[in-house]
Amino acid sequence: MCTREAVRMSREHDLPEIPSRRLLLKGAAAAGALTAVPGVAHAAPRPAPYENPLVRQRADPHIHRHTDGRYYFTATAPEYDRIVLRRSRTLGGLSTAAESVIWRAHPTGDMAAHIWAPELHRIGGKWYVYFAAAPAEDVWRIRIWVLENSHPDPFKGTWEEKGQVRTAWETFSLDATTFTHRGARYLCWAQHEPGADNNTGLFLSEMANPWTLTGPQIRLSTPEYDWECVGYKVNEGPYALKRNGRIFLTYSASATDHHYCVGMFTADAGGNLMDPGNWSKSPIPVFTGNETTKQYGPGHNCFTVAEDGRSDVLVYHARQYKEIVGDP
């Protein structure tokens, strides 16, 4: 985490093409920001690029485009003590949109420190926020927690604390994301597996409800390539995108300095997602720092849809400098 990260956006044509079959560079998808234009013989005009950074001093961005046509933005605040929310009719409008605090850390006990990586989801007519937090007395005992709000407007109503997401182990865990596929809801997250020679790997489980796992949890990935093990052996920050008969799962790797980067898995949408053998992992990162643009350590991304309702947009955090003083 970093108090000086900035949220940025990119479209498909802003990113270099990666020569790997596992990145699905055919059809209507490409590495980074993906564009889905089914049934169109000629490419649609490309919208103007976004102005970066979109939001300063925020990390781990998440943007939800709601059925009301508005974009809802949340991210890690640099003080790690609250969950914030903004909304706008346009993606660019999030830069200047008013920000509200929808929940604050507890003064003591659980959910009191390291409030990280919130994600806002609309599930079954209610709003949910997944986030990481730790007790005041043990700030690295980080776990995954869930908030629920039944009001149609997430800026109103009451955010009820549904509790901790209980995984197979009581160990360091964070960066939960959720998605549905073929009638089932899944949770994907990062966690330290007892006895493993790494900081965190990626895990997947089906859900009984928005705060409870059900059935087995599987290990999708552990840091194995050199680019996943710089500084720390880390796989974290997963996010899913379903397009063109495949499921793309991006994630972040290595220490959260300028070596931080994005990797990716793909799975056939017709396969069993709970079978690790159905997922293919890219042996190279799909998004890294860039000296030309002076963007370093891109990571913990999400995907949203542009105002045209068709173009997928990659939202990520990065820095404009390499050297870090203090907490990275």
From Swiss-Prot:
PTM text: Predicted to be exported by the Tat system. The position of the signal peptide cleavage has been experimentally proven.
Signal peptide positions (record): 1-43
GO BP field: arabinan catabolic process
Marked site (Important for catalytic activity, responsible for pKa modulation of the active site Glu and correct orientation of both the proton donor and substrate) residue numbers: D175
Top-level lineage group: Bacteria
Catalytic residue list: D60, E236
Pfam families assigned: Glyco_hydro_43 (PF04616)
Temperature profile: Optimum temperature is 50 degrees Celsius. The enzyme is inactivated at temperatures above 40 degrees Celsius.
The UniProt record lists the keyword Hydrolase: yes
Enzyme Commission number(s) from the entry: 3.2.1.55
Entry keywords, A to Z: Carbohydrate metabolism, Glycosidase, Hydrolase, Secreted, Signal
GO molecular function, one term: alpha-L-arabinofuranosidase activity
Reactions that this protein is recorded to catalyse: Hydrolysis of terminal non-reducing alpha-L-arabinofuranoside residues in alpha-L-arabinosides
Primary localization: secreted
Record's subcellular location: Secreted
Pathway assigned to this chain's UniProt record: Glycan metabolism; L-arabinan degradation
Function (record text): Involved in the degradation of arabinan and is a key enzyme in the complete degradation of the plant cell wall. Catalyzes only the cleavage of terminal alpha-(1->5) arabinofuranosyl bonds of arabinan present in the arabinofuranosyl polysaccharides or oligosaccharides. It cannot act on other arabinose-containing polysaccharides and arabinoxylo-oligosaccharides.
UniProt-recorded name of the protein: Extracellular exo-alpha-(1->5)-L-arabinofuranosidase
Annotated source species: Streptomyces chartreusis
